[in-house]
Swiss-Prot record:
NCBIfam families: L21. Keywords: Ribonucleoprotein, Ribosomal protein, RNA-binding, rRNA-binding. It comes from the Bacteria. SUPFAM superfamilies: L21p-like. This protein binds to 23S rRNA in the presence of protein L20. It comes from Borreliella burgdorferi (strain ATCC 35210 / DSM 4680 / CIP 102532 / B31). This is Large ribosomal subunit protein bL21. One of its GO terms (molecular function) is structural constituent of ribosome.
Length: 103
């Protein structure tokens, strides 16, 4: 059983009992998470598609931890100008455990 859920404007595939890597969430929301913006639910081949969301559906999750992704390095070099720029960025993600999908 899996569901497509919209969290902070992005869509994720949530499977019961598995971890979900989402963009970092605020500390206020970190206790028990419930998302009701479910776009699609698939249970044993039976598919429910929302318009835009599935009515009376919910995904319950548990917050686990925040982690940083690998560093992405951006480098710009301008020839003949003695100009170069190097910038690094590490995106922070939250890992949540999908407890159950209710519909």
């Amino acid at each position: 059983m899996y569901a497509l859920v919209e969290i902070n404007g992005k869509q994720y595939k949530a499977i019961e009992g598995e971890f979900l890597k989402i963009d970092k969430i605020s500390p206020v929301e970190k206790d028990k998470l419930e998302f009701n913006s479910v776009l699609l639910i698939n249970k044993d081949g039976e598919v429910k598609i929302g318009k835009p969301y599935v009515v009376n559906s919910l995904i319950r999750c548990t917050y686990k931890e925040d982690k940083k992704d690998k560093k992405v390095v951006s480098y710009r070099y301008r020839r003949r100008k003695s100009s170069e720029r190097k910038v690094g960025h590490r995106q922070t993600y939250s890992y949540i455990l999908v407890d159950e999908i209710v519909f």
